[in-house]
Amino acid sequence: VEQAKQSAKLMQDEIDDCLKESNFHGEMRHMIEDCARIGSGVVKGPFPIKRTAKVFRDIGGVKEFVTLSEIKPGSKRIDPWNFFPDPACGESIHNGSYTWEREYLSSRQIREMIDMPGYDAQEIIYALKEGPKVSQSRQASDGSQQKAEEQFELWIFYGQCDADDLQAVGVETEDESPKASAMAVMLNDRLVKVTLNVMDSGDFPYDVLAWQRRPSMPWGMGVSRQVRTPQRMLN
């Protein structure tokens, strides 16, 4: 029993460390702000993040300054304007067939993906040589204009795919079902990653919080919409 308690305590510490490293509480506050402002907040996690740390190591009596890279789980807030669930999902995105997430990344962030497991390093290098294909200005969620000339547009897909299509790109399914839950990443119209969904249930690594629920849709109603009628009465 004591050994089980000690193991559980060590695992709890490991989970807490991962949450702190990914600034989980800060991301949740940002997500709640989205909820109050526009009615919905989106959070993603857990998903793999490459983390780098510099430490001193004593090797044979000689101290060396080494750089360590690890893949750690993380969570983050997603801009609701960059998240596109299946329109037929109803009030829960997990009832839909797919989700799309759009990200704008710098060339440095793209280079960091080369060493991450599951990514096609050669396709990423080709995309870096091509440069960003997004050349027009884009509108931010707060209404301001943001230049995307130096940013790459990345699309992340989770959903049901034909088993034959997955096998064509080298992904073997675990049973004879005609469809399987998969994850794919597109960069500059290049397929840089395809793999089966790590969730056996086929659920997506996203959650949507609605400030005030609206029937038949995952998106909620924010504070400004809630007080519209009283504000009109006062005006």
Enumerate the language-model features and the residues they cover.
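Extended alpha-helical, oligomerization-prone segments that build pores/tubes and scaffolds
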Residues: 1-235
